[in-house]
């Protein structure tokens, strides 16, 4: 009976998308709950429907379910405690349970080892608190990264629109030049072609810059998403794994976010046809 209740409890705290214990859980309008990151990625390229019942959702910005988050934390803490009291986690020197975490070296210590000369000057905390702190650090990093992904998408959309407008502008300007020559200078066909060539050269110069700018934004978008997915996988790990040294991942995430390719806005005045239009 107790085993069945425990299994049912864990099932309720399992994300239907990733099938891991809920991380930063959110509950949508139909009542189903998911990891925030799983829902972000699920809705990114498709209409906002519940992945379970397919009910449409008008809302996309959800607050974390505090109750579910606390319950999920209890499940993770229970798994961590099971490891902490295991024979595998006993100090080989003092035969004590290693219930203290050294923040400096990212290792588990027993009470006596934490007070040794080697570790006395390091920052220590209970392993459970260290795990919770690492999870919060991870969730903040993911939130920041997701905001950067959305910002980058807006820049990409703006660049696509600008390329289309620029191509249209080139066509319209060329038509205007030809119309002006036909109306006012019908005999100057050579000058007309030179004028058109000048226009195309200048216009294509900016068009190429726009396309390169778009390619840079697309590449940044790919890197941001790959980093987000890497952090998401990390967030689904048990606390025992989460307490390993992940500083390199955080450094890479922060470095990627420093890259800020902006949509290019060329000077439309660069296509003015002096002395003619």
Which residues make up each language-model segment?
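RING-family zinc-binding modules in ubiquitin-system proteins
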Residues: 1-277
């Amino acid at each position: 009976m107790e085993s069945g209740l425990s299994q049912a409890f864990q099932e309720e705290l399992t994300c239907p998308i990733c099938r891991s214990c809920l991380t930063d859980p959110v509950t949508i309008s139909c009542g189903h709950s998911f990891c925030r990151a799983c829902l972000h990625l699920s809705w990114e390229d498709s209409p906002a429907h519940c992945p379970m019942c397919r009910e449409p959702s008008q809302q996309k910005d959800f607050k974390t379910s505090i109750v579910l988050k606390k319950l999920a934390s209890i499940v993770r803490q229970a798994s961590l405690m099971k490891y902490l009291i295991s024979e595998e986690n006993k100090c080989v020197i003092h035969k004590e349970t290693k219930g203290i975490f050294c923040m400096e070296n990212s290792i588990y210590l027993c009470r006596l080892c934490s007070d040794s000369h080697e570790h006395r000057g390091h920052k220590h905390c209970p392993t459970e608190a260290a795990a919770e702190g690492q999870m919060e650090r991870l969730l903040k990093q993911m939130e920041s990264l997701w905001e950067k992904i959305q910002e980058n998408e807006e820049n990409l959309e703006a660049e696509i629109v600008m390329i289309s407008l620029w191509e249209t502008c080139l066509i319209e300007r060329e038509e205007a030049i030809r119309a002006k020559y036909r109306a006012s200078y019908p005999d100057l066909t050579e000058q007309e072609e030179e004028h058109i060539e000048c226009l195309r050269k200048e216009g294509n110069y900016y068009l190429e810059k726009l396309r390169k700018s778009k390619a840079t934004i697309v590449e940044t978008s790919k890197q941001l998403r790959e980093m987000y997915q890497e952090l998401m996988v990390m967030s689904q790990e048990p606390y025992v794994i989460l307490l390993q040294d992940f500083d390199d991942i955080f450094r890479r995430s922060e470095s990627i976010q420093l890259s800020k390719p902006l949509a290019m806005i060329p000077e439309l005045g660069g296509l003015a046809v002096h002395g003619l239009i």
